Amino acid sequence: YLTLGFLTSLLFPPYFFFPLGFIIFPSLCLLLDSNRKNNSNLNSFKNFSLFGFGFFINYLFWVKNPFFVFEETKNFFLVFLLLIILLSLILSLIFITILKFGKNIPIFFLVPFIFTLTEYIISVIFYGFPWFTFSLVISSNEYLLFSLKSFGTLISSYLIIQIFCLPFIFITKVNLKKEMRYLSLFIVLPIIFLLVLNVNSKNNNLKTKTIDLEIFQLNFKNNDKSLTPEKKLNSIINNIQKSTSDLLIFSENNFPYL
């Protein structure tokens, strides 16, 4: 579970190892399906907590970086682990609850629902926590962004994970015809419908404006004492002056120097 959690984080920026999803989620479905009747709640809680920790510790490892901006806070950087543990516990509790009350629902449909529900609950608790959404997995693919435009982040997250779980159906071949009918009715047909709508909207949208966008991720070395705040600011200013783009975006860890 710890390994699967870590591998799941590689689907997200900046890695975007998209094909991994077709290995990770069928494996997770197989584990859950084989153990859902035999595992105790305590054992399940431990397993899902390990999955969450493996996922969040790599995916949100950068959260510690703001602690290194100032000398006064760098000794408190381990505080970021509290966020990792809290998110892991939330994910684990939701997994246990949904699996307990959804015993008769195929695991193929439960897994995407669990992750999407977790995404929603975390966004409510943390007032729109912006980093935990599986819709980010397709953010580097302009051809798949129609899903975000048409569905929004939550439904896009569900669809992405549901597609990743597809190999599980063919591996187990349990209730294959029934699950394929559900999949066609609730997933495939809506996607085809929205693809057609997306193509039509592009054809009808005659007013377009192209702008140049440049994104900066200036990862200053925290252990480099020669990099004073003034030097970091000068580096940011130099990048701004050299850029010819219409819109510039800097990462949040560069804001303290602006």
Task: List PLM regions with ranges.
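Soluble catalytic regions of membrane-associated enzymes that act on cell-envelope
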Residues: 197-258
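Membrane-embedded alpha-helical bundles of multi-pass enzymes
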Residues: 1-201, 256
